[in-house]
């Protein structure tokens, strides 16, 4: 059952790159604790961190009985596993995100997982996902970092995601406004 993950990690070793794992769909679900502690390396990426899929096809980061982040999730983060949002169409659930953020468990990277099935749902674009994390209590500097510099570092392209002399210019000027916009 672990062969696809192990082969991906082996390819990552050969390429000297992290792997990103979209994990789930096994019946019964494989353990994410085992994934983090026995299969992934420091710097490997776990996406769809805050998902809660129907049918119990993927283990969650928050224990649904206690509403607390599972202890091994904290251990995995300390070990260097990168936790990515990967918002997508069905890959994000506030019942996982809110308790996580309240406990101080912020994602390392914020991404959209934009595809034809997700672009016309609650996730429109990167800024809408960033706004949700800001509103859930993630500090603005951390939201910006998790959307720019942190992903560039994770994928080993430090010429991206920052403002520096000689850096690649990809700049957005944002205005933080309060109000009712829905």
Cite the ranges covered by each PLM segment:
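Histidine/acidic residue-rich metal-binding segments in metalloenzymes
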Residues: 1-83, 91-108
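Active-site metal-binding loops of divalent metal-dependent hydrolases
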Residues: 51, 88, 114
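C-terminal amphipathic alpha-helical segment
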Residues: 82, 88, 134-135
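His/Asp/Glu-enriched, well-ordered alpha-helical/loop segment
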Residues: 93-176
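Short, Lys/Arg- and Gly-enriched loop/turn segments at beta-strand edges
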Residues: 178-182
């Amino acid at each position: 059952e672990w062969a696809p993950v192990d082969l991906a990690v082996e390819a990552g070793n050969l390429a000297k790159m992290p792997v990103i794992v979209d994990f789930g769909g096994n019946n019964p679900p494989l353990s994410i604790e085992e994934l983090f502690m026995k299969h992934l390396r420091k710097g490997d990426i776990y996406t769809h961190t805050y998902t809660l899929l129907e049918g119990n096809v993927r283990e969650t980061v928050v224990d649904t009985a206690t509403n607390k982040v599972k202890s091994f999730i904290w251990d995995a983060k300390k070990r260097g596993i990168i936790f990515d949002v990967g918002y997508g169409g069905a890959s994000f659930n506030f019942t996982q995100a809110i308790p996580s953020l309240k406990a101080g468990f912020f994602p390392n990277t914020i991404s959209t997982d934009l595809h034809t099935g997700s672009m016309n749902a609650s996730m429109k674009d990167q800024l809408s996902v960033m706004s949700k994390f800001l509103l859930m209590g993630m500090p603005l500097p951390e939201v910006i970092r998790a959307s720019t510099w942190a992903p560039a570092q994770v994928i080993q392209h430090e010429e991206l995601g920052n403002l520096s002399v000689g850096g690649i210019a990809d700049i957005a000027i944002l205005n933080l406004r309060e109000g009712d916009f829905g």
